[in-house]
Regions:
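Structured mid-domain segments that build the active-site/substrate or prosthetic-cofactor binding neighborhood
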Residues: 1-141, 208
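Gly/Pro-rich turn-and-neighbor structural signature
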Residues: 59-63, 80, 84, 147-195
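Short, glycine/alanine-rich amphipathic alpha-helical segment
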Residues: 142-146
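Single conserved hydrophobic/aromatic residue that forms the stacking wall/gate
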Residues: 197-207
Length: 208
């Protein structure tokens, strides 16, 4: 298994809304919000439109998948170059099945966020100086992931399929088989610190 940590799909959603700019981290040279993702046009409406958000999110997911696979390919190549695990490989059958292990952090958070945008009204609170979304207000009720509600669960099915399809479009190291895992606990504690929330507009905290 070529292990490769995980991708923060919740942060990716914020990049889709803010045109690839990071709402928390500044460029050291310019002092302005860092342009991390592709410089797409940000969403400027007062309330988020589901179709508009989804269209931009698809593009940002595809960019993230490409970056993710490229970095993991480099990591696995350098690992084999400088520390090939020959002792462990000696115990493996002749026909080796290699998997390319990707992962997702913030899965349920993205589902709840998209669900809030689709089924309720989400108002964007923008930074007065940068114009970037930095908080959200929700008006109305919306289905949440983990409650056996197909409206939320179907968003999760779409999200997993979309991201894994984007992963599979890329060449993986040694033609390994792309897989993904939906991770919890430690990854969501760390990754939550880099986020502002949509479905739960609070200060940064661990995401579920």
């Amino acid at each position: 298994q070529f292990f490769g940590a995980r991708a923060n799909l919740a942060k990716c959603l914020l990049y889709a809304i803010n045109g690839g700019k990071d709402e928390k981290f500044l460029d050291k040279k310019t002092g302005k919000p860092m342009q991390v993702g592709p410089e797409y046009s940000p969403i400027t409406s007062e309330y988020l439109d589901y179709d508009e958000v989804l269209a931009k999110y698809k593009k940002m997911l595809d960019w993230l998948a490409g970056l993710y696979v490229n970095i993991l390919n480099l990591i696995q190549y350098m690992h084999d170059k400088y520390y090939y695990e020959s002792a462990e490989m000696a115990l493996i059958d002749t026909d080796v099945r290699r998997t390319f292990a990707t992962g997702i952090a913030g899965f349920s958070h993205v589902i709840d966020s998209l669900s809030a945008i689709k089924y309720a009204k989400v108002k964007v609170i923008r930074n007065a100086e940068t114009g970037l979304a930095e908080d959200f207000e929700i008006e109305g009720e919306f289905p949440k992931y983990g409650n056996d509600d197909d409206r939320a669960d179907n968003i999760g099915v779409w999200l997993l399929h979309e991201f894994l399809t984007d992963i599979k479009k890329r060449h993986t190291y040694r033609n390994s088989e792309p897989t993904t895992s939906i991770l919890t606990i430690t990854s969501n504690v760390v990754y939550g610190l880099s986020l502002i929330h949509i479905s739960e507009p609070t200060r940064p905290e661990p995401i579920s």
